[in-house]
Amino acid sequence: MATDFRFAGESAVFGQPEVLLGILPGAGGTQRLTRLIGITKAKEINYSGRQVKADEALQIGLVSAVFADDDCYPQALEAAKSYARGPKSLQFIKRVMMDGLALPLDEALKLEAEAFGDCFETEDRLIGVQSFLDHGPGKATFTRK
């Protein structure tokens, strides 16, 4: 649960069975699940210890996508490669989203505005804009600088 995206094979099963052992989900299990899927569903899963199949996990936001079992790893790897080729602004986006969650909205918006300005100081902004003008969206090869 401590990743940006979670992919599952269609036969995957998830759960927080610790309550059935008389303990609670440790290592962040209560907090991460709640932040991912909301408190009502997280309570249901944590209180019951029941298993969640892949299709339900997708429906409640526990996973980002479900693929055929044999196709899951290649799909996840391709997604990771795609993000790794992305612009420096991806770093700003992740930081602002994660840090902003802990801030009041007005402060989070200031953080976003600062990061927006920082994007204009990157090589990737120049590359992205020129590529858009020359070739349309989604064609740039970024340097992550």
Predicted regions and their residues:
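Terminal peptide-recognition signature
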Residues: 33, 57, 93, 132
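CoA-thioester-processing core
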Residues: 1-47, 59-60, 75-79
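Generic structural signal for alpha-helix termini and adjacent loop/cap motifs
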Residues: 122-123, 135
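Hydrophobic alpha-helical segments typical of transmembrane helices
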Residues: 29-32, 41, 92, 112-115, ...
